[in-house]
């Protein structure tokens, strides 16, 4: 048990979405509070013991302080909640009663495929966490921001985390940033871009990343084809529908 005062899901039957979401939000209150408290301590100690006087001497006189927070594993959380909501997820417990795995029956929407059912859950998770972050007191009245960025900790976190209702296995890396779960985006690059585009930037002003890889051969056979297809992908993923033609 990581912390006291939080009751686990009871019984061996299928998980109920509303019950899980309620418990998830309660747990987020503790996680966010502990996280922000740690950040406040870190920045206080940095100012006290390693103040960056040279850097601050070169800074603008009007200082706007921000506090960068971040989340990882967004796609796994979104897919797991979608599985609980739209499929049948039954927890598997060990001899102590601890949930160590899940049996998921039926289909469920997957984040990263331009499916509003899963994408809306992802956006709600980001918004909920940022709302809880904003409610915390910050060192030197810093303005809190949140990132959903590609960082190497997605590998470390995965090694220390158990299995999920989405099918993500214990000890395996999280997908980076706001990427869909590894291997779960089946509708192409543009669909994944459209899913990520549904995350509200106001909830993640520190940045949202989507890491995609494509070979030149995958874009087309000739240089002209590759240029045209790459432009088409960028236009489809980044140019709003109501944007005026340039």
Q: Would you name each region that the model predicts?
A:
Residues 1-246:
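Acidic, glycine-enriched catalytic cores built around paired aspartates
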